[in-house]
């Protein structure tokens, strides 16, 4: 499941505010995505994160 993947900032130096599902807390948490090399646990909105990961 993408919701159990770790937060992955990526190797690029962009600045994209995103959300990931933190499986330890059971919550969608904000983080800054670098723009490339991430994984599926990377959502543009809090609503999208909550809808997919049922947070």
UniProtKB/Swiss-Prot annotation:
Highest taxon of the lineage: Eukaryota
BPTI/Kunitz inhibitor domain ranges (all copies): 3-53
Disulfide bonds: 3-53, 12-36, 28-49
GO cellular component terms attached to this protein's record: extracellular space; nematocyst
Signal peptide residues on this chain, from the entry's feature table: none
PANTHER family to which the protein is assigned, alphabetical: BPTI_KUNITZ INHIBITOR DOMAIN-CONTAINING PROTEIN, KUNITZ-TYPE PROTEASE INHIBITOR-RELATED
The protein's name: PI-stichotoxin-She2a
UniProt organism field: Stichodactyla helianthus (Sun anemone)
């Amino acid at each position: 499941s993408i919701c159990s993947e770790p937060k992955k900032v990526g190797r690029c130096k962009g600045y994209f505010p995103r959300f990931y599902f933190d499986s330890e807390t059971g919550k969608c948490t904000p983080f800054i995505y670098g723009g490339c090399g991430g994984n599926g646990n990377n959502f543009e909105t809090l609503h999208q994160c909550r809808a997919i990961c049922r947070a």
